[in-house]
Amino acid sequence: MDRVLLLLSVLSLGVSSQPITDSQRLFSIAVSRVQHLHLLAQRLFSDFESSLQTEEQRQLNKIFLQDFCNSDYIISPIDKHETQRSSVLKLLSISYRLVESWEFPSRSLSGGSAPRNQISPKLSDLKTGILLLIRANQDGAEIFPDSSTLQLAPYGNYYQSLSGDESLRRTYELLACFKKDMHKVETYLTVAKCRLSPEANCTL
């Protein structure tokens, strides 16, 4: 929380006075945060898979490949070439939406262990940091043009009491989608951060 307040103070002092230096620092913090979340997502998914029988893994993976993540409704680059062509503001806006889409579902990932209980607060901190970066880079443009009213439906069966098999499937889906989305956000923020370094090679 102290770090968030510090970032807010930096913004209020005017990031425009030193756009490169302040943006680079804010980007470094945001990238570090999403890298931590991505690694955490990978570990949680790996641990969950390890607890399954081989046939359960095969069936759940088969089902997941035929299904969609809730966040797939958020329009994002379809490949690395489109990612590299996207503006910094677009990458930040998509990252913000992806993180925001996990604020509610992430609650079901919490509990049972210290790492799981870190997810929601770390997502909140990351969302705040990305919003600061959007404001610092928007140059008068709308933050979320055309799609500010986008509403995502909850994950399937989220509110229901589920049988053992359905509960297993929902947990697998949530962990797999969380890992997938944190990888996306890490990629988008890393590319956007690289754009601030004219000498850097931002090839994915």
Swiss-Prot record:
Primary localization class, coarse: secreted
- Please provide the record's keywords in A-Z order: Disulfide bond, Hormone, Metal-binding, Pyrrolidone carboxylic acid, Secreted, Signal, Zinc
Example GO CC term: the record gives: extracellular space
GO molecular-function annotation terms? growth hormone activity; growth hormone receptor binding; metal ion binding
Determine if Repeat is one of this entry's keywords: no
**What's one Pfam family the UniProt record gives for this protein?**
Hormone_1
Record's InterPro entries?
4_helix_cytokine-like_core, Somatotropin, Somatotropin/Prolactin, Somatotropin_CS
- Sequence positions that bind Zn(2+): H36, E186
Q: Name one GO biological process term.
A: response to nutrient levels
Could you say which residues form the signal peptide? 1-17
Kindly list the places in or outside the cell where this protein is found, as annotated in its UniProt entry: Secreted
Q: Which residues carry this modification: Pyrrolidone carboxylic acid?
A: Q18
Query: What are the annotated disulfide bridges?
Result: C69-C177, C194-C202
Similarity annotation: Belongs to the somatotropin/prolactin family.
Biological role stated in the UniProt entry: Growth hormone plays an important role in growth control and is involved in the regulation of several anabolic processes. Implicated as an osmoregulatory substance important for seawater adaptation.
Q: What is this protein called?
A: Somatotropin
Q: What is the native source organism of this protein?
A: Sciaenops ocellatus
Q: Which gene encodes it?
A: gh
